[in-house]
């Protein structure tokens, strides 16, 4: 199984590609799609869509796992990021990927074993599991790796949150 992990965003979209085969997990790539706040929103969304398509075409994942969005206060930011997330989902749908989403609590529970783990604990665990020399940077990429790991660990136990 090949998983595309996504940490949704408009300025920075974290992504990762993990392979899971014979109980072995291998990270093929992780990184970020970045857009400039100086660019018009339609241009930013178009760029994200194009870059997502390139990643999907290159790596041919089976599943796509998203971190569920959570916003506290800023409605304008929530709307803009939600629009970007819609574009990210659309690129996966157009490539016939199965879509799943996980809450931050589920991701922390799956990766660290504790749903209230802090960001640093999650990053250190990701580094250990995948035998990285250092924590993936930036944080958005590390989050995307954690999302993909959550999906892989969930698949072992048939604990998959298929997007409705």
From Swiss-Prot:
Binds 2 Mg(2+) ion per subunit. GO terms for molecular function: crossover junction DNA endonuclease activity; DNA binding; magnesium ion binding. One of its GO terms (cellular component) is Holliday junction resolvase complex. Its main location: cytoplasm. PROSITE patterns: RUVC. Keywords: Cytoplasm, DNA damage, DNA recombination, DNA repair, DNA-binding, Endonuclease, Hydrolase, Magnesium, Metal-binding, Nuclease. Pfam families: RuvC. GO terms for biological process: DNA recombination; DNA repair. HAMAP family: RuvC. Homodimer which binds Holliday junction (HJ) DNA. The HJ becomes 2-fold symmetrical on binding to RuvC with unstacked arms; it has a different conformation from HJ DNA in complex with RuvA. In the full resolvosome a probable DNA-RuvA(4)-RuvB(12)-RuvC(2) complex forms which resolves the HJ. PANTHER family: CROSSOVER JUNCTION ENDODEOXYRIBONUCLEASE RUVC. The RuvA-RuvB-RuvC complex processes Holliday junction (HJ) DNA during genetic recombination and DNA repair. Endonuclease that resolves HJ intermediates. Cleaves cruciform DNA by making single-stranded nicks across the HJ at symmetrical positions within the homologous arms, yielding a 5'-phosphate and a 3'-hydroxyl group; requires a central core of homology in the junction. The consensus cleavage sequence is 5'-(A/T)TT(C/G)-3'. Cleavage occurs on the 3'-side of the TT dinucleotide at the point of strand exchange. This is Crossover junction endodeoxyribonuclease RuvC.
């Amino acid at each position: 199984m090949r998983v595309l992990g996504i940490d949704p965003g408009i300025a920075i979209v974290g992504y990762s590609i993990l392979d899971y085969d014979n109980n072995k997990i291998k990270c093929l790539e992780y990184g970020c799609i970045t857009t400039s706040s100086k660019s018009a929103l339609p241009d930013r969304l178009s760029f994200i869509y194009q870059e997502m398509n390139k990643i999907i075409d290159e790596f041919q994942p089976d599943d796509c796992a998203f971190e569920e969005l959570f916003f506290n206060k800023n409605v304008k930011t929530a709307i803009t990021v939600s629009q970007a997330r819609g574009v990210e989902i659309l690129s996966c749908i157009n490539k016939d990927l199965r879509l799943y989403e996980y809450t931050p609590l589920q991701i922390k529970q799956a990766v660290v074993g504790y749903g209230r783990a802090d960001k640093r604990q999650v990053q250190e665990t990701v580094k250990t599991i995948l035998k990285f020399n250092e924590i993936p940077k930036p944080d958005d990429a590390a989050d995307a790796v954690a999302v993909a790991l959550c999906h892989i660990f969930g698949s072992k136990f048939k604990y998959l949150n298929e997007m409705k």
